[in-house]
Amino acid sequence: LINSEQDTESFKSIGTYVEIIDFNNLPNGLLGITVKGMHRVEIKSAKKDEDGLNTGSISPISEPSVDDQALLAKFPELINVLVQLKNHPKIRELPIEIDLSSADSVSYHLGGLIPLTPLDKQLLLDAFDAGQRLNILSRLIEEISSEKPST
């Protein structure tokens, strides 16, 4: 995510290392790319080359250990939402493996499947651990569910 709060163009300091798992030509002539997030990374440096390509150096971020069972027990509603999403026909087509006994897996997959703004997705990436992500997701889902549909 590009940091637009600064005068000069820069990147947020936390991102995701991804692997390309599929690509296809879209009707508008662009190339659609499907990626799988592998792990969080810290962006150490970034620069824009003469041809406009952004390059940089990164280092992986180790996830802190959490008590998955105790943490997930605090958020049964989030697991329920994720199970419902996981069973949706369009989601079942995706090559994702969700471990419902892992707080990291639940928080990252739920954050990737619900409609969030780029800033909210960055907020999840910036969270220290799965506990913070689950707290943020709980609040965001509550906000989404309390929004009145536009007529």
Residue spans for each PLM region:
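N-terminal low-complexity, acidic/polar interaction/targeting segments
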Residues: 1-151
